[in-house]
UniProtKB/Swiss-Prot annotation:
The keyword Membrane does not apply. Gene3D superfamilies: Hotdog Thioesterase. It comes from the Archaea. One of its GO terms (molecular function) is fatty acyl-CoA hydrolase activity. Its EC number is 3.1.2.-. This is Putative esterase SSO2140. Keywords: Hydrolase.
């Protein structure tokens, strides 16, 4: 029997280019929680070898979406709002990102996400909301 976490990871790598670009590894998925890891890569950095804020934000968005997915009983979801505080420069990978569902309503799922370096230092903290889609949305 195939590992369900690996199966989800493969589906996202095929369907989501940013997931593939960031080389996301899904560490854990359970109801209301997702943990992923991304590597340190030079192409992810800005001056001084510090991880670029856009990379951190993208990884947080992916992780929050995966956490929301674990409680979503509908067809799909989209990021509605994402607020982040960058707390420390990040330069020591791999980086661990953990999302925890705070509340699932009928139309919105609220998730808290933390971004940490290889030593467990908290580099960013975010809160976001994912809008629940009851019908599948396709790009035109």
């Amino acid at each position: 029997m195939e590992d369900p976490i690996k199966a989800i990871e493969e589906i996202f790598k095929k369907a989501d280019q940013i997931f593939k670009f960031l080389d996301v590894k899904v560490i854990n998925l359970e109801k209301g929680r997702a943990v992923v890891e991304i590597p340190y890569k030079e192409e992810f950095t800005r001056r001084g070898g510090v991880l670029h804020g856009g990379i951190i934000m993208s990884a947080i968005d992916i992780t929050g979406g995966l956490a929301a997915l674990t409680v979503n009983d509908a067809m799909d979801q989209v990021t509605q709002e994402l607020k982040i505080n960058f707390l420390e420069p990040m330069y020591k990978g791999p980086f661990t990102i953990e999302g925890k569902v705070l509340r699932k309503g009928s139309t919105v799922i609220v998730v808290e996400i933390e971004f940490k370096d290889a030593d467990g230092k908290l580099g960013a903290k975010a809160i976001g909301s994912w809008y629940i889609l009851r019908t599948k949305v396709q790009a035109k």
